[in-house]
Design a protein with these regions (language model features):
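Soluble or luminal CAZymes and related metallo-dependent hydrolases
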Residues: 44, 48, 90, 175, ...
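Residue-level preference for long, well-ordered alpha-helices that form the structural scaffold
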Residues: 41, 45, 282, 286, ...
């Protein structure tokens, strides 16, 4: 029996290859309702499962309920259980419950090129800083993509094992074939300029692979195997390593999905998440680059990575709201929402995490817009109330007579004032001499 989890593909799948070597395989997926999810992630999962089912010739068994109870019944019927190992706090807790119930899972492979916990210092402790982690991560290396030993014979599901979730909202294209096509297209068209253009919000030059990696529709090994030593390829390799670094950090510090990596920041003065938070959520802060990012997130379930940092900095250091509020909102809205990358991406910007940008680094939302959306085309796409303004005006519409004439809101705070306030609150944490 092959238990699919965050690995919804057939290619480069060590656990599936191991299961196939034992003979006939029952491919299964269990919908565990004890795990909270958003409408967007649930709908994306539904589409990805449908794509996987097509690849399996309509033989995917989909169950609904408690994994322990379901697997007890299935193991008596089908025998050995194979699965890709998972490393999030909830997945580890689930697998401990399975072990307590004396259910043996044959874990083969992981969602990462290098399994969390393998990259360590010479004294055996985990890395807290990305750059030395990256060097050892590269030195540890990864296997070549695996192949299925032969076309397996799938065990057909009974009628009561087809409990697919429903698609209840608009979703982007999903599935293994889509992921592979996207990777090939990015490799041919945009990867060569990735080091120069990846931060430009107005250029559609990012990989678009985040959601496919999150759901295991493509394995990072498949991508890494095709990268060379050019500057652009090296920068992209480092971005994949950031994902693996954050997974490693969360593996060693599982409380940091919701709590501070640096506990002293829990003592900082924060504001309640009231009307200002609502304005941030809806893209109505009065800062065009911030609002464009939030409106893209709300409309599409995705946001450019540069914008993720800018809007996070604005929430934490301009509005003085704790990072967890923003992280939860991202988890609700993003199709690519990943516990480790989301929590530690937020903590990096907040200055509270491992290898973090220091708290005193405050992104200027106006200058960020000018630098990474110089003509204002990204802003105008998502904030049409500013489409009438020239490129020189769109980043500070409040300075111009007709800047707010089409319904765009006034600024809810003054950035310069709130930057000083953020630094003052940071100073309060320092011990007095």
């Amino acid at each position: 029996m092959m238990w699919f989890r965050r690995d919804l593909r057939l290619g480069d799948h060590p656990a599936l290859a191991a299961a196939v070597r034992t003979g006939e395989v029952a491919p299964i997926y269990i919908r565990d309702h004890s795990l909270a999810t958003s409408e967007r992630r649930s709908s994306y999962l539904a589409a990805s499962l449908q794509a996987l089912d097509e690849s399996l010739g309509g033989n995917l068994h989909v169950f609904e309920g408690n994994p322990v109870e379901i697997l007890k019944k299935l193991s008596a019927q089908y025998g050995e259980i194979f699965a890709t190992e998972e490393f999030t706090p909830r997945a580890i807790l689930r697998d401990k419950k399975l072990a307590k119930a004396q259910l043996t899972i044959n874990h083969v492979g992981s969602p990462y090129a290098v399994t969390p916990g393998r990259v360590r210092k010479s004294d055996g402790t985990p890395y807290r800083v990305y750059t030395p982690f990256y060097k050892v991560w590269c030195a540890v290396g990864w296997r070549a993509p695996s192949e299925l030993p032969a076309l397996p014979k799938w065990i057909s599901p009974p009628p009561d094992a087809r409990k697919f979730p429903k698609i209840t909202c608009e979703i982007p294209a999903s599935g293994e074939l889509v992921a592979l096509d996207r990777w090939r297209d990015f490799y041919k068209t945009d990867l060569a300029r990735y080091d120069e253009e990846r931060n430009r919000a107005d250029l559609n030059t990012t990989s678009g692979l985040a959601r496919h990696l999150r759901w295991g529709e493509i394995h990072p090994r498949t991508i890494l195997a095709e990268l060379n030593q050019t500057e652009a390829h090296d920068v992209f390799r480092k971005e994949i390593a950031w994902r693996e670094f954050y997974a490693d950090v969360l593996f060693h510090e599982p409380h940091t999905n919701l709590d501070y990596y640096k506990p002293e920041f829990s003592r900082m003065r924060y504001n309640e998440a009231g009307k200002a938070f609502e304005a941030w959520c809806h893209g109505k802060t009065g800062y065009p680059f911030v609002d464009a990012g939030m409106r893209q997130l709300n409309a599409e379930g995705w946001m450019h990575n540069r914008l993720r940092m800018v809007v996070a900095s604005f929430l934490i250091k301009d509005l003085h709201i704790e990072w967890q509020h923003g992280a939860r909102y991202f988890m609700e809205k993003l199709f690519d929402a990943d516990v480790a990358s989301n929590a530690h991406g937020w903590q990096w910007t907040a200055g509270t995490g491992t290898d973090a940008s220091p708290y005193y680094r405050v992104f200027n939302p106006i200058e960020q817009g000018r630098r990474f959306d110089p003509e204002g085309s990204y802003i105008k796409k998502y904030v049409p109330e500013l489409a009438h303004l020239a490129a020189s005006e769109v980043h500070e519409p409040w300075l111009y007579l007709d800047g707010l004439s089409h319904g765009y809101p006034e600024r809810i705070v003054d950035h310069a004032t709130e930057r000083h306030e953020a630094l003052a609150r940071l100073a309060e944490l320092k011990p007095r001499s």
